[in-house]
Regions:
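Class I S-adenosyl-L-methionine-dependent methyltransferase catalytic core
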Residues: 1-207, 211-252
Length: 252
């Protein structure tokens, strides 16, 4: 990857892109932007080798049926992209390791809660089920409830309980869905949502093993945290590098 994929306002001495045999994942693309490190590879292989982080923030693949939707479904290219990229197949919960993070924030589909909550409850000191409320949900229900709420779970070890003032500690955050397709990813989370999550996270270091186009990294950098991201899709990885490079330039 050429350094030019990073926003041009970032000083070149603060950016390194290429292969680093001395680092975990030496056989993959590694990009460093100041103190922040991005890996283009599979998270299940690399994440355990990266060690401990204060906060793990992730939007992993959901597990749901992408069929149905009636006449409206025919025009839903977002769902088609989700299926093409395998983002409807769920994820292996064991990538969340309570020995490798102080706390985890993970989005999930409603149908994943029955399996995910017992796993987190048995792994962490406490957890809370939180919600992102969308005032502009897709106009469909597909023999279910409308997707006006999206679930995320915050589970933490002792000492990594929710941070922020009383307003920050609300279990619900409201923001319109991100309908800007320019980022090329079907499930981009809004800045308002990610900023709130990072404010609730204790500690200094943040990792996102399913980085996508870098929304967690942007929020982490703006909050003064040190970010590490992993993304296996090269196209999304390049978008994340550009966005995180711009965020880093904006605070330096």
């Amino acid at each position: 990857m050429d350094r030019k994929v990073v926003n041009a306002t970032v000083a070149l001495q603060d950016v390194w892109c290429g292969y680093d045999p001395a680092a975990p994942g030496g056989d993959m693309t590694v990009t460093r932007i100041g103190p922040h490190t991005l890996y283009c590879t599979d998270a299940y292989d690399l994440r355990p080798r990266l060690g401990y982080f204060d906060a793990e923030v992730m939007d992993p693949p959901y597990l749901f049926k992408a069929s149905g939707g009636g006449a409206f479904r025919k025009s839903r290219d977002i769902l088609d992209q989700i299926v093409e990229e395998g983002l409807d197949k769920g994820f292996d919960h064991t990538i969340i390791n309570p020995l490798l993070c102080g706390a985890v924030f993970t989005f999930c589909h409603n149908d994943q809660l029955a399996d995910l909550l017992p796993y987190l409850n048995g792994s962490f000191h406490r957890y809370a089920v939180c919600f992102w409320r969308k005032p502009n949900p897709l106009p469909m229900a597909n023999k279910h409830y409308r997707a006006d709420l999206e679930v995320y779970i915050h589970a933490w070890n002792r000492g990594f309980h929710p941070q922020g003032d009383l307003t920050d500690r609300m279990r619900m955050v409201e923001s319109r869905s991100h309908r800007d397709r320019s980022l090329g990813h079907p499930t981009v989370k809004p800045d308002v949502v990610m900023d709130k999550i990072v404010r609730n996270a204790a500690g200094k270091t943040v990792i996102d093993p399913f980085m996508g186009t870098g929304s967690t990294g942007v929020a982490a950098i703006r909050a003064g945290r040190i970010f590490t991201g992993i993304e296996k899709n090269p196209k999304h990885f390049e978008t994340a590098v550009r966005r995180i490079g711009a965020a880093y330039a904006g605070v330096n």
